[in-house]
C-alpha cells in the first residue's frame, strides 16, 4: 500500500524577507518592528495566550516555523477584543492573519465543569483572568476582518480544530455551526498543522488567495453546495441512518439454466476466443485506493444534527472513523446552502521534521514586555521537554487523537538531549531538575504498528482497547535508553516524569517500570484508572482494573528494591456517560477498601468533538454502528446526580454524608451504613458527637439538608490514607503543551499536580 507523500517542511525555498535574519523575539509592537528594520509584517498571528517564545506554546512554534521559511512574523497577544484598534497594532499583514485561541479551548480555559467563571488564567501574566473572550477564535477572526476588510484570515489551534464541523457546545447547551461559518475565516487548519501552514504561506506569497486553496490536507473550507474538485470525484451519502444497502434482484426461479446462460452472454460472439483477465490483489487494492482518494463522504447536515441526536451521533462516528491519514476520505457537511469541506488528515511529521521544528531558535523565555510578571503556565513547563506527539489510546473523554492524531511522532535522541542542554545553559534559574520528558503520554515514545501496511489500512479507534493490538510494538527500550542518556548529561541532577503514563502498556515492559520507579518518581506517581466498573470503563475505552493491579504490584516491588517509600495516586472521573449510581457506589467501596481518600474531585465536562461528549449530548453510543433502535447510554445530566457522583468520590467528607446516606437508602443498600468494615459511611455524620449519642440511644436523627459540596478547580487526586500529609518530591504537575484538552478535566494549574496517565 503506497504511503501518501508529503513535501518536507524544511525543503521550501525561503521567502525573500529571510535577509532580515532571526529576531530575538517576534515583534509585538511597531517599535520592535522598527528595531528589526521591518516596514511591515508578512504574517500576523493573533493569540489568546501571552507570548512565550518556547515550543510548548503554539504561537511561538508557529511563528518560529514561519520565520524559518523567510517570512516576517508579528504577534498580537491577548488583544482588547472590544474594538478592532488592537488588531491594527502592527499594521496590515502582507499575506494574512493567523488566528488562535491559544493552547486551550477558550471556554474550557474560562469556565469550570459547572459553567462557573474561573478566577485565574495560567496563560496570562500574574494569572489575571478575563484577558480573552468566549469563543476567542470567532471573535478574533471577526475583528481581523473589521480591522482590514479583504485580508486573508486563517484559523487554527485546538479550539478551531475541534470545532471544525457542527458540534455540541456544553456552555450554551446546543449544537453550534462549524467555527468556519461563525468566524467568517477563509480557511481552517486542524491538528498541529505545520505542513499545511508552510504550504499555505508559500502559496500565498505567490499570490494565491487563502479561499482558493482547496487541495491541502488537514484543512477545512467553505464551498457552494455540491462543489467537487473535478469530475472524477464521487460522493458517498452517509447523511441518514437505517437505510438498507444494495438489494440485488431475485433470480427468476422459473427460468431455465440455458436461458440464464444465454441472457448472460448477450453481445458476445461465441466463435471468437474470450480473454479472461484475473486482477491481482495488488491491482484490486490500487483501484480501491484510487477510488477512496477521489471519494467524499457526506455526513448529516448542521440543520439535521442540531435537532436529531441519532444523526449527530452518526456524524461523530463517521468523522472519527475517517481519521487515519493512510485511508481517510474527505468529508463534507452542509450548512444552509453551503458546504463545509474537510480534506483528509495531514501526513504525520517525520523524526527529522520533528527535530527541525523543535530545534528552531526559541528564546525559551516570556517576551520582555511582561517584565517580572508571574506566568503560571511558563513556570510549569520551562524545565520540561516534549519528546513526542499523538496518542493511540483513544480515550473517549479526551480529544488528543482528534487533534494530534493516532500515529506517534517522535523526536530523535540527539534533538531531545540537545534541548536539555539548552535548558541547562540558557534558562535562568535552572538547578539541574528536568520536570518532565513526555508529551500527551509518557510512554508512547517511538511506539508504532509493527507493519506500516496494516497501520495505513487500520480503522480502529484505539490500539489498546479492549486489548492491546497484537500488531502494536510495545518495546520501551528506546525510552529506557533515552532516560539513561538524559540522566548522564553533566549538570542534570534529577529528571521527573510528569506526563500521563499508560500503565497498561508499561506492564508489557517491567524493565521500563523499574527504570521509572527507581530514577524518575519523586514520591508520588499519578496514574488514571478513571473508574473501577466495566460499564463506564467500556464507554471511556479504558482498561479494566486488572492492568492497574498488575502495575501496582510491579510499582511497589521495584520501590521496595530501591529502598524508596513511594505511592501511586489514582485519578477518577465522576459523572462520565455510562456511569450509574451503583457504579459510583462500587467505586467508593473500592476506594475505602484500598484506604484511599480523594482530596479534590472533578466531574465530567463535555468538550467539542470528544466521543464521550457525543454520548452525553445524544445518549447514544457512537463506538458502535448507529440506528434508531441502538442502545441508550445512561447520562448524568441533572444537578442532583452530578453532585451525588462527586460525593461518592469523597465518601469520607462530612459535607457529603447526608446525600450519600439518602442515596444508599433509596438504592436499598442501607447495609453499607454502619461501623463495620464493609460499610461505606457511619450511621451519623463524621464529627457530629450529639447525633452519634442520639443514634446510640435510639433517638431519631435530625437529617436536615446537607451542606453544598465544594467544587475545587483541579483534577481528582487520591492520597493513600497512610500518606496523607506526606510531601511528594516530584516536580510540578501537568504540562500545558499545545492542544491537550480532556473532557472531565480542569485545565492544568501550575503547582496543582493535575497531569496523569490516560
Swiss-Prot record:
Q: Does the keyword Metal-binding apply?
A: yes
Instruction: Please list the residue ranges that the record marks as compositionally biased, kind Gly residues.
Output: 727-737
Q: Where is the signal peptide?
A: none
Kindly name one Pfam family recorded for this protein: Radical_SAM_N
Annotated region Disordered: the residues are: 698-758
Q: Which cofactor does this sequence's record say it needs?
A: [4Fe-4S] cluster
Q: Can you tell me which residues bind [4Fe-4S] cluster? A: 391, 395, 398
Q: Which SMART domains match?
A: Elp3
Q: What is this protein called?
A: UPF0313 protein CV_1738
Biological source species: Chromobacterium violaceum (strain ATCC 12472 / DSM 30191 / JCM 1249 / CCUG 213 / NBRC 12614 / NCIMB 9131 / NCTC 9757 / MK)
Amino acid at each position: 500500500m503506497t504511503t501518501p507523500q508529503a513535501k518536507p517542511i524544511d525543503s521550501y525555498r525561503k521567502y525573500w524577507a529571510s535577509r532580515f535574519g532571526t529576531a530575538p523575539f517576534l515583534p509585538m509592537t511597531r517599535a520592535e518592528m522598527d528595531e528589526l528594520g521591518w516596514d511591515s509584517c508578512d504574517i500576523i498571528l493573533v493569540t489568546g495566550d501571552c507570548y512565550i517564545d518556547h515550543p510548548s506554546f503554539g504561537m511561538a512554534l508557529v511563528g518560529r516555523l514561519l520565520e524559518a521559511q523567510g517570512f516576517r512574523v508579528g504577534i498580537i497577544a491577548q488583544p482588547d477584543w472590544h474594538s478592532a484598534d488592537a488588531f491594527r497594532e502592527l499594521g496590515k499583514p502582507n499575506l494574512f492573519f493567523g488566528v488562535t485561541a491559544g493552547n486551550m479551548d477558550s471556554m474550557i480555559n474560562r469556565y469550570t465543569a459547572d459553567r462557573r467563571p474561573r478566577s485565574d488564567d495560567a496563560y496570562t501574566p500574574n494569572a489575571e483572568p478575563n484577558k480573552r473572550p468566549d469563543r476567542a477564535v470567532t471573535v478574533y477572526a471577526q475583528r481581523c476582518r473589521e480591522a482590514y476588510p479583504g485580508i486573508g484570515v486563517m484559523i487554527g489551534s485546538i479550539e478551531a480544530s475541534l470545532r471544525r464541523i457542527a458540534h455540541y457546545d456544553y456552555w450554551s447547551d446546543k449544537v453550534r455551526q462549524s467555527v468556519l461559518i461563525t468566524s467568517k475565516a477563509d480557511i481552517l487548519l486542524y491538528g498541529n498543522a505545520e505542513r499545511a501552514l508552510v504550504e499555505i504561506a508559500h502559496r500565498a506569497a505567490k499570490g494565491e488567495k487563502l479561499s482558493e486553496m482547496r487541495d491541502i490536507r488537514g484543512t477545512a473550507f467553505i464551498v457552494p453546495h455540491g462543489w467537487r474538485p473535478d469530475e472524477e470525484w464521487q460522493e458517498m451519502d452517509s447523511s441518514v441512518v437505517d437505510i438498507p444497502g444494495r438489494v440485488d434482484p431475485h433470480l427468476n426461479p422459473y427460468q431455465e439454466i440455458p436461458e440464464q446462460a444465454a441472457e448472460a452472454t448477450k453481445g458476445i460472439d461465441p466463435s471468437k476466443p474470450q480473454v479472461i483477465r484475473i486482477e491481482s490483489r495488488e491491482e484490486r487494492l490500487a483501484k480501491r485506493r484510487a477510488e477512496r482518494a477521489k471519494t467524499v463522504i457526506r455526513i448529516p447536515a448542521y440543520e439535521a444534527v442540531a435537532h436529531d441526536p441519532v444523526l449527530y451521533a452518526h456524524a461523530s462516528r463517521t468523522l472519527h472513523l475517517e481519521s487515519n491519514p493512510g485511508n481517510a476520505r474527505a468529508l463534507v457537511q452542509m450548512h444552509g446552502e453551503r458546504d463545509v469541506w474537510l480534506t483528509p488528515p495531514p501526513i504525520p511529521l517525520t523524526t527529522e521534521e520533528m527535530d527541525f521544528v523543535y530545534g528552531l531558535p526559541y528564546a525559551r523565555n516570556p517576551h520582555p514586555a511582561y517584565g517580572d510578571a508571574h506566568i503560571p503556565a511558563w513556570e510549569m513547563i520551562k524545565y520540561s521537554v516534549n519528546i513526542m506527539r499523538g496518542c493511540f489510546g483513544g480515550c473517549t473523554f479526551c480529544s488528543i487523537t482528534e487533534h494530534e492524531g493516532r500515529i506517534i511522532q517522535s523526536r530523535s535522541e540527539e534533538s531531545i538531549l540537545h534541548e536539555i542542554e539548552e535548558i541547562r545553559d540558557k534558562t535562568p534559574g535552572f538547578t539541574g531538575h528536568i520536570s518532565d520528558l513526555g508529551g500527551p503520554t509518557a510512554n508512547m515514545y517511538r511506539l508504532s504498528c509493527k507493519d506500516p501496511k496494516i497501520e495505513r489500512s487500520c480503522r480502529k479507534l484505539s490500539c489498546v482497547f479492549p486489548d492491546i493490538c497484537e500488531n502494536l510494538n510495545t518495546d520501551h527500550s528506546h525510552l529506557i535508553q533515552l532516560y539513561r542518556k538524559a540522566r548522564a548529561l553533566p549538570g542534570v541532577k534529577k529528571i521527573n516524569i510528569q506526563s500521563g503514563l499508560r500503565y497498561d502498556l508499561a506492564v508489557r515492559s517491567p524493565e521500563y517500570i523499574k527504570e521509572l520507579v527507581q530514577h524518575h518518581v519523586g514520591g508520588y506517581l499519578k496514574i488514571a484508572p478513571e473508574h473501577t466498573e466495566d460499564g463506564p470503563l467500556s464507554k471511556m475505552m479504558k482498561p479494566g482494573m486488572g492492568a492497574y493491579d498488575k502495575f501496582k504490584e510491579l510499582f511497589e516491588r521495584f520501590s521496595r528494591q530501591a529502598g524508596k517509600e513511594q505511592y501511586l495516586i489514582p485519578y477518577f472521573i465522576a459523572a462520565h456517560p455510562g456511569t450509574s449510581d451503583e457504579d459510583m457506589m462500587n467505586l467508593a467501596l473500592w476506594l475505602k477498601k484500598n484506604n484511599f481518600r480523594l482530596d479534590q474531585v472533578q466531574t465530567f465536562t463535555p468538550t467539542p468533538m470528544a466521543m464521550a461528549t457525543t454520548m452525553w449530548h445524544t445518549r447514544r453510543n457512537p463506538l458502535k454502528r448507529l440506528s434508531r433502535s441502538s442502545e441508550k447510554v445512561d447520562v448524568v445530566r441533572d444537578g442532583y446526580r452530578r453532585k451525588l457522583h462527586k460525593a461518592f468520590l469523597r465518601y469520607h467528607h462530612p459535607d457529603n454524608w447526608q446525600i450519600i446516606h439518602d442515596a444508599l437508602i433509596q438504592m436499598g443498600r442501607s447495609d453499607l451504613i454502619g461501623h463495620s468494615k464493609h460499610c461505606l459511611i457511619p450511621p451519623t455524620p463524621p464529627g457530629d458527637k450529639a447525633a452519634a449519642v442520639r443514634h446510640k440511644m435510639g433517638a431519631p436523627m435530625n437529617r436536615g439538608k446537607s451542606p453544598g459540596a465544594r467544587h475545587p478547580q483541579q483534577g481528582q487526586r487520591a492520597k493513600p490514607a497512610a500518606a496523607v500529609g506526606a510531601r511528594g518530591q516530584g516536580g510540578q504537575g501537568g504540562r500545558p503543551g499545545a492542544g491537550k484538552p480532556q473532557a472531565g478535566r480542569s485545565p492544568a494549574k501550575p503547582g496543582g499536580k493535575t497531569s496523569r496517565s490516560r
